Structure formats: structure tokens, C-alpha cells
Amino acid sequence: MRLETIRQSMRATGAKDCHIDRVLRAWTQAKPLESGARRHQPENFLPQALRTALPALQEELSALARVRSEHPGEDGSSRLLVELADGQTVESVLLPRDGLCISTQIGCAVGCTFCMTGRDGLLRQVSSAEMVAQVVLGRGRRKVTRVVFMGMGEPSHNMDNVLEAIDTLGTYGGIGHKNLVFSTVGDRRVFDRLPQQRVVPALALSLHSTRAELRAELLPKAPHIDPTELVELAEHYARTTGYPIQYQWTLIDGINDSIEEMDGIVRLLTGKYAIMNLIPYNATATLDYRRPSLEHITTLTKYLHAKGIRTTVRNSAGQDVDGGCGQLRARTLDAGTATDAQKISLKHLKTGTRSAA
């Protein structure tokens, strides 16, 4: 269901925009309808026809997304397995410090080799209403002031729904525009469309390598944009919006954790309005990748800091509860052990010298 469909159903009752806005504001903020009203009963500010239709509408909204299971993590996060109305499931993650990560697709077409979400390809799009419903579920559990579109799926492949959800959360949900984060592997449409929106979100860009050939192997179906050009496009967005770009880099042992790669980061990001988020890989039994040692992660972080690159280390939230993207859903679906054809080999992914000397 699209959010515009919800508006149209209320408009069909004769409701005016001010009435529709009131209902959307209450829903997206997970508050009672009378919350904040000068006159506290709905009959004082909503027309009779809309009040009559509200119970059925509220039931329909509640059915958009339900929590099938909740898995608190030791880091203060809580991973939610969310069941949609058709029985499909997605993951949402309540993050420390009032954040929420939501999913935009069931499956993913990009096929990042280190990610569980895309192993079966794209199953279907998540609608704008289903995205907002994930936020409503999260707000029913704790305070949410920041939403990142960084869960299952590639937001640029579901652009209309994602932008509609962002507009609704920024307009009615009480979330600051810079606290709505659009995450992407890099798609030219992102840089064209996002700055034109009423609600302009911050941008997170999945980089993972500064070498075009390695990045193409790690992200086989991402748009083929050279990392240098990608960073230039992102820098223009950062300067236009005033929001720093959050670069994401999944650190994989022996693949993209060499000092040569760090020098590539320095080359691309020096002088840029940017934050580099190093995300140590969250190991799974079905993918042949490893997480670098804590000592090596610390060495890389210090190296980038010394070169003037603002860097953070962000572990996947809820690592003790299948914290990597798509892992909880995969476990729930009882995927089992990967076949030889499914198991990813590292031999063809060549990396540079790893020494920090």
C-alpha cells in the first residue's frame, strides 16, 4: 500500500487535507489521535464520515506490519523480525541513541557478495506505507528520532516508495531532515532526485573499496561508476545539502583491509565533507568471509585518523543476534548450510599488502 492510497481513502470520505494531516501525524508519531489537540475528542476536529471510517483504517494500518519476534542485543540494540500483511518478513533494528534502521525491499538485486539479503535476489518492493509502519512499530517500543533506510534492500531501486516515506516522516513524523538517511550503493538517479525533494535526507554511500575492479566484484550488480566519480557526485550532494556523506566500508579480512586500500580512502576523501564508517564484517556460517582482528581494525582506524580522515568503527547492531543485514530473516527461514554453488569463494578477490609498516 502506498501512503498516497491512505490519503485517497480518507479524502473519499470528504476529509480535508487538515483532517488527513491530523490522522497521519498521529499515526507516524505513534500517538493517540487526540494527542496535541486543543479540543481533546476526535468529534471536535474530525468530520463524522472520517470518524466512521477510522476503525477500519486503523485496523488496516495495524495489519501493515507486525512484530513476529524481537531479539535484544547486548549493545542496547534490538532486532525486530517484522511480518508484513502478505506474510513476507523484513528486518528492522532499534539502534542505541534513538535510531531505527528499516528495510526497503524484500531481498535485493544488487547481490553484494558479503550480504545475506541478496542471496535469493529481489522478491518484492516494500511499499511506502510498510516502511512507515516499521517506524510506527519501533516508536511503540522506544523513542525514535533518527531513521536510516539501511536495512534489507537497495533504496534507489525502490525510489518512489522510499522518497514518499521520507517525505511523510519528515513532514508528519517529527523527524529532522538530516536524521533521515538514504543509504545507497551509488546510483546517478539518487544525486538527481534527492536534492529536488521537499524533505531532503542525508546520504550514506556504500563504498567498500576504492578500486573499481574489486568494488565491482563485491557489488556485482551495482551501477558501474568509478569510485573517484562516485565520491565527486557525493561531495556535490554534501555541499549542496550541508550534510556530510556517511561512507560505509564493510571490513573483510584479507579483502579490503589493506593499507593500500586505506591510502585509497585518504586519496579520495581528503578535503571532503565526509565521515568514514568502518563496519567489521559480521561472520555467517554460509559465507566464506572473515572479520579482521580487533588489533588490525584499531590499526586501520588510527592510520586514517593520522591522515586526517574522520573515521568511526561501527559494528553491526546486535551481533549476538544475527546482526548482519538479512541474517535474522535467513535464520528464520531455515536456510540451512549453503551449497557449494552458493558458497562464496575468496580466491578471485585479490587484495594488496596488509602490513601497516
Swiss-Prot record:
Domain Radical SAM core, residue spans: 94-320
UniProt cross-references to Pfam families, sorted A to Z: Radical_SAM
EC primary class: transferase
Entry's family note: Belongs to the radical SAM superfamily. RlmN family.
Domain of life where this protein originates: Bacteria
Classification via PROSITE patterns: RADICAL_SAM
Binding site for S-adenosyl-L-methionine: 153-154, 183, 206-208, 282
Organism: Dechloromonas aromatica (strain RCB)
InterPro entries in the cross-refs: Aldolase_TIM, Methyltransferase_A, rRNA_lsu_MTrfase_RlmN/Cfr, rSAM
Any Gene Ontology biological process: rRNA base methylation
Active site: 91 (proton acceptor), 325 (s-methylcysteine intermediate)
GO CC annotations, alphabetized: cytoplasm
Cofactor: [4Fe-4S] cluster
Note accompanying the cofactor annotation: Binds 1 [4Fe-4S] cluster. The cluster is coordinated with 3 cysteines and an exchangeable S-adenosyl-L-methionine.
Keyword annotations of the record: 4Fe-4S, Cytoplasm, Disulfide bond, Iron, Iron-sulfur, Metal-binding, Methyltransferase, S-adenosyl-L-methionine, Transferase
Location relative to the cell: Cytoplasm
A single GO molecular function term of this UniProt record: 4 iron, 4 sulfur cluster binding
Name this protein carries in UniProt: Probable RNA methyltransferase Daro_1157
NCBIfam families: PRK14464.1 (NF011034)
Bridged cysteine pairs (disulfide): 101-325
Binding site for [4Fe-4S] cluster: 108, 112, 115
Predominant location: cytoplasm
EC number(s) per entry: 2.1.1.-
This protein's record includes keyword Flavoprotein: no
